[in-house]
Amino acid sequence: MVMTDPIADFLTRIRNANLAKHEVLEVPASNIKKGIAEILKREGFVKNVEVIEDDKQGIIRVFLKYGQNGERVITNLKRISKPGLRVYSKREDVPKVLNGLGIAIISTSEGLLTDKEARQKNVGGEVIAYVW
């Protein structure tokens, strides 16, 4: 089966594992998936991220995070820019997710950044996803 949007597949796997309350998720690795996973870790949405090298492309192991009573830290993830309809944001129009409670992941000339980092560095780019 040919996968047309590996980023959407990655976000869907995280969403499904989160809804099923799994502790660990393994997905095939790519540079953009590694970047998204590192942003989720840095922003506190996941516990840890490990990249396991193998003879092929590698595997990303994501350790999901839950609250004291088992409530989900990630409420939802939404793919914004899709292969059929790319969504770009100028530096003045970088989106806020739920008035700053969530994050927007943006692919910029400076690499993958959150919406806050993009505003600080004064750059725009392709809006990859929203996480809240």
Curated annotation (Swiss-Prot):
Which GO BP terms apply? translation
Q: Does the keyword rRNA-binding apply?
A: yes
Q: Which InterPro entries match?
A: Ribosomal_uS8 (IPR000630), Ribosomal_uS8_CS (IPR047863), Ribosomal_uS8_sf (IPR035987)
Q: Cross-referenced Pfam families, in alphabetical order?
A: Ribosomal_S8
Q: Cytoplasm: is it a keyword of this entry?
A: no
* One cellular component term from this protein's GO annotations in UniProt: ribosome
Key words, A-Z: Ribonucleoprotein, Ribosomal protein, RNA-binding, rRNA-binding
Q: Which Gene3D superfamilies does the protein's record reference?
A: 3.30.1370.30, 3.30.1490.10
Output one GO MF annotation: structural constituent of ribosome
NCBIfam families in UniProt: PRK00136.1
Q: How does it assemble?
A: Part of the 30S ribosomal subunit. Contacts proteins S5 and S12.
Name the family: Belongs to the universal ribosomal protein uS8 family.
Q: Enumerate the PANTHER family for this protein.
A: 40S RIBOSOMAL PROTEIN S15A (PTHR11758)
- Biological role: One of the primary rRNA binding proteins, it binds directly to 16S rRNA central domain where it helps coordinate assembly of the platform of the 30S subunit.
Name this protein carries in UniProt: Small ribosomal subunit protein uS8
Q: Which gene encodes it?
A: rpsH
